[in-house]
Amino acid sequence: MSRLGIFGGTFDPIHHGHLIVAEVLKEELQLSRVLFLPAGQPPHKIGRPITPIAHRLAMLQLALQGNPHFAISYVDVRRPGPCYTVDSLTLLRREYSDAELVFLMGEDSLHDLPTWHEPNRIAELALLGVALRPGIEVDLQTIFARVPAARDRVILVPVPLIQIAASDIRRRVAEGRTIRYQVPLVVEEYIARHGLYRTVEAMMPTMTPRTSGV
């Protein structure tokens, strides 16, 4: 059975940090493909300014072109309302019934997993491939105590320390500063061509502490 990676996010915008981590996880976890899962309306970002999905999808498509192992899943953007991870994985489980799903996340997301919506069901639907930055320790036993289904379902993968953040990219654009080499050139050109992230609102972080709505 092949392994299929699921990489969820707002991707506002997609940047080289996302791409490098996805490539490392693909190799280390022996994934046949990585599906990038852009969120239409993340439940933990309601009330925050988010770039329209059409632009985020276009940038994602540009960034992934040329890599046959990277693709986009549209299951979240095609349905209305908040996108819960457990619902997304349920739909993907039906669509890819012949593959083993691996939900890709950072160690910060793993730490917050007990607060997510139906965390045990999430762990039942997919393995959890966790990108572990240098010098970070994860208290797995505490997580397993709160999410029993995650026991034996977590795979920790060391990844390079890449200090690129979408919020910083948006801030730099709003301030008229360069984002060269932080995003693929085609994404940089798209941002400039469409005048994205030039307002004060664009400088606000779209990431908030994860809640039970994730």
UniProtKB/Swiss-Prot annotation:
Record keyword Mitochondrion present: no
InterPro entries (alphabetical): Cyt_trans-like, NadD/NMNAT, Rossmann-like_a/b/a_fold
Database matches in SUPFAM superfamilies: Nucleotidylyl transferase
Catalysed transformations (reactions): nicotinate beta-D-ribonucleotide + ATP + H(+) = deamido-NAD(+) + diphosphate
GO terms (BP aspect): NAD biosynthetic process
Keywords on record: ATP-binding, NAD, Nucleotide-binding, Nucleotidyltransferase, Pyridine nucleotide biosynthesis, Transferase
Organism domain of life: Bacteria
Enzyme Commission no: 2.7.7.18
GO molecular function: ATP binding; nicotinate-nucleotide adenylyltransferase activity
Protein family: Belongs to the NadD family.
Function field: Catalyzes the reversible adenylation of nicotinate mononucleotide (NaMN) to nicotinic acid adenine dinucleotide (NaAD).
Descriptive protein name: Probable nicotinate-nucleotide adenylyltransferase
Organism: Thermomicrobium roseum (strain ATCC 27502 / DSM 5159 / P-2)
Gene: nadD
